[in-house]
Amino acid sequence: MTNTRMLAAVAVASVLAAPAFAEDLTIVFKTTGGGGGGTVTHYFSSDKVRTGDADNETVMDYAAGKIVSIDHKKKEYSEITFAEMEAGLKAAAAKVDEASAQMQQQMATMPPAMREKMEQMMGGAASAVTVTKGGTRQVAGYTCQDYTLAMGQAMTMKMCATTALQYPMDYRKFQALAGSAAAMANNPMFKGMGKMVEEMKKIEGLTIADSTSMKMMGRSSESSREAVEIKKGPIPAAAFDVTALTPGYKKVPHPITKLK
């Protein structure tokens, strides 16, 4: 499983394990990673979400059923509906099925040790996922519980979650979309997704700090984020105004719509 697939799997699992809805939230994170440090702001309302930094942003409008991706550097943006997203995920799953079948045929002729290593790369590590509870600490004025999520030896994610905060949207309305992504768990390349979802249910509350360490194909990467400001209360509609966020920007096709 590639780094992107791993992170996507964690994202899906996070949505499926999301807490109940509450009032609007604005969270500012300090981040570190391969591209250097920075600041990312997340806006959560009952029907919209906006996340991103000075370079890239994403606006999700659950009421309208669409997602807008904004590239401030290129001055471009793209839109995709939930229906198109679901179709794209299904198309991606079909391609993964095809690639997996070909890989399985090739693996059948490999020595056992090499075959085992390939299976781990194709997602077997997800079935070895574990969540361990740690101590508590303070982040941005909130007490949070430390957890360590380990996916074999390929990825370790340390998270600190607080039960004092909740997402304002009701994710149960959008489980069909999450289900489309999770459906790829039926493919051998994503086996163990169910195990991941179950393990992540042990993480109680909203994550306000995390760090990720990944090792893949002889390479390693480190990234982290920690909330430095958390505000509760109504968010102005202007914060989600795509027109205002993309002045003079060019609209381009969303990459997922090209998956056929």
What function would you assign to each model-found segment?
Residues 8-17:
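Bacterial N-terminal signal peptides
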Residues 21-260:
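Extended soluble regions of mature proteins
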Residues 1-8:
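Bacterial N-terminal signal peptides that target proteins for export
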